[in-house]
From Swiss-Prot:
A cellular-component GO term for this protein: membrane
Keywords: Glycerol metabolism, Hydrolase, Membrane, Transmembrane, Transmembrane helix
Entry GO MF terms: glycerophosphodiester phosphodiesterase activity
Annotated gene: GDPD4
Keyword hit for Transmembrane: yes
Positions of transmembrane segments: 35-55
Catalytic activity entry: a sn-glycero-3-phosphodiester + H2O = an alcohol + sn-glycerol 3-phosphate + H(+)
Gene3D superfamilies xref list: Phosphatidylinositol (PI) phosphodiesterase
Identification of the protein by name: Glycerophosphodiester phosphodiesterase GDPD4
Gene Ontology biological process terms in this record: glycerol metabolic process; lipid metabolic process
Keyword Membrane (UniProt): yes
Tissues in which the UniProt entry reports expression: Expressed in rosette and cauline leaves.
Amino acid sequence: MAIFEWRHRRRPFDGGGTRRRRFFSPLYSRNFKRTILFAVIFLAIFPPLYFHFKLRRIRQIVAQKCDWLHHPPLVCAHGGDSTLAFPNTMDAYSFAIRSRVDCIEVDVSRSSDGVLFALHNRDLQRIARNSSVQVGDLSMKQIKELDVSEIVKGTLGSSRIPTLEEALALISNSVRKVILDAKVGPPMYEKGLAQDILSIIERAQCNNCIVWAKSDTLARDIIRRAPDTMVGYIVMVDPLTGARNSLLRMKGARVVGVYHPLIDEELVRVVRRRNKEVYAWTVDDADPMKRMLHLGVDAVVTSDPSMFQGLMEDLRTECLEEGFSIRT
């Protein structure tokens, strides 16, 4: 009888149910639920956050690439469009105007008898087939006798070298800005040059003219004589020292013409803080052109304005396709 009762009091084999009940204890169940909850929260929050920051980064990249569209730089034709005609000729200026450039840079040199021509020494040397001749070595009559068509075929109009006054008569009312790049040389160097330039600007009524030069003496003389005239100075690498010229060195100047490899974000910020504009020169290749756009310079001087205009249009299309919005 005792044996029978003992057998009935034994806990029957439950097939592992006890272990399962212990396995799913209240403590374990709470931890499991907490883990599941955290996983659900993570899956609910992380993907949206990831895509939010990913989209934000994409927008930042697009904005950096496309922000120049809010303030596009002036397209400045260096000596006109010298890919289609000889630089600083009426043909080159006409091609640039037809391309609807924003501005034209004119090289300004003075003859031995004091007449200002739209001419650079290197171009004179090509025309005259003389590697050492300078504009100041020749008189007005001698320069007027030179014929560009002898080295460049297919000219549209005059094949003669224009005076500065003739050049301004053609271009000053056709573009937003005219840059006069004044060259200092023998026999008179800076003597009287500022007044000669200002006199022609006044006669041509070129209110949109900018005068800049590598000679700070000349630039300061123009500022002193005509404070309302827009004046710039040049920043480049000093050929003697290999160092960059001082960036902020002329109070009355409103434009800083910078050799384009020297331009970076910091340079642009520093110049803008002084209420001056940054003009990049001379930019003739696609990669530097894109770089100038991304840096947000105010103007780009180029010998190939049509190429720069085409590049800007292509980038503009890309930006709009990527969802960039141009403020109006």
